[in-house]
Structure formats: C-alpha cells, structure tokens
Amino acid sequence: MAKLHDYYKDEVVKKLMTEFNYNSVMQVPRVEKITLNMGVGEAIADKKLLDNAAADLTAISGQKPLITKARKSVAGFKIRQGYPIGCKVTLRGERMWEFFERLITIAVPRIRDFRGLSAKSFDGRGNYSMGVREQIIFPEIDYDKVDRVRGLDITITTTAKSDEEGRALLAAFDFPFRK
C-alpha cells in the first residue's frame, strides 16, 4: 500500500475531523481520482506525435491512455469530428496514491523556477487543477528520448464539498501551495 494512503488514513482523517468538526469518518474529504490529460493538437498533421504523447503518458502513469477525439469539426483549427487530438488517463486506487506521492515529492519540486502552486486553481467544488509545461519533470521520462517537450493537465478530484475543504485536504498532504 502507498505510504501516502496510510498517512491519509492515520493522520489526515483525524486532523480534518477536528478542523471541520465532522461527526463521521465518511464526511472527511478524500482524493477520489487523478486525471492526466495531454492535448496534442499537432497530431492532425503527424500521427506519430500522438503515439509519442501516449507513450509518455503511459510511462508517467503506468497505465495505457485513452485516445481522445474531437467532439465537433472546427474549420479554424482544421479538425473534423472524430479526429484523434489528445490522450488522457484516469488514475484511481493504488496507482492514484503512488502517482500522487511521486507528484508531490519528486515531480513538482523539479518544475523550473518553482515558487509554489497557485491556491486559486480550485473549481468551487473542492477539485484542484494544475498545468505542467514540461513532461520531463517526471523521472520516468528519459530526457534523451523526448522528441518534443509537451505539457499536460493534472486534475485532482476530491469528495470535498467546498474549496476550503479541498485546500485543507491537499495542504494536509504538504501540497506545495504558494504562500
């Protein structure tokens, strides 16, 4: 079992129960899933780019990504409905906790000019979204084999009812928010 999951069950639950005066352990917010999304708009011209992006996402997450397709045709972007334009992975359970631990301890501190993550990136329902400009911050990606530096979106979905609860949950994991 991931260390962070044990830490959540042993420490974070108790801390949040006293902070928010919950009556039941089931009221305490928890991390439900983590979604990684990589938009590869250039895949319209070169299909190999999408394969490389999917390979990067597989290395980062340890799970085969789902190829996302365009929902509707947009003439300005020269895309048609059904064109493959990105890939995404939804992590739950053990893989989610392992990724979350690697994200906090290894990947985020490797971001160039890192001063902390914005605490304003909550969606109003306790879910946190962040963008990463370079996939090479993850140690699973071999810098020499990267054909192009790509960014990805990371969404942490929680069961929190408000941004305040979500922020408290992530802060309990020592999430590096900007002061």
Swiss-Prot record:
Keywords: Ribonucleoprotein, Ribosomal protein, RNA-binding, rRNA-binding, tRNA-binding
Domain of life: Bacteria
Pfam families from the UniProt entry: Ribosomal_L5 (PF00281), Ribosomal_L5_C (PF00673)
InterPro entries membership: Ribosomal_uL5, Ribosomal_uL5_bac-type, Ribosomal_uL5_C, Ribosomal_uL5_CS, Ribosomal_uL5_dom_sf, Ribosomal_uL5_N
One of the GO BP terms on file: translation
The keyword RNA-binding is assigned to this record: yes
Quaternary state and interactors: Part of the 50S ribosomal subunit; part of the 5S rRNA/L5/L18/L25 subcomplex. Contacts the 5S rRNA and the P site tRNA. Forms a bridge to the 30S subunit in the 70S ribosome.
Function, as annotated: This is one of the proteins that bind and probably mediate the attachment of the 5S RNA into the large ribosomal subunit, where it forms part of the central protuberance. In the 70S ribosome it contacts protein S13 of the 30S subunit (bridge B1b), connecting the 2 subunits; this bridge is implicated in subunit movement. Contacts the P site tRNA; the 5S rRNA and some of its associated proteins might help stabilize positioning of ribosome-bound tRNAs.
Family, as annotated: Belongs to the universal ribosomal protein uL5 family.
Protein name as annotated: Large ribosomal subunit protein uL5
Organism: Salmonella arizonae (strain ATCC BAA-731 / CDC346-86 / RSK2980)
Lineage summary: Bacteria, Pseudomonadati, Pseudomonadota, Gammaproteobacteria, Enterobacterales
Gene designation: rplE
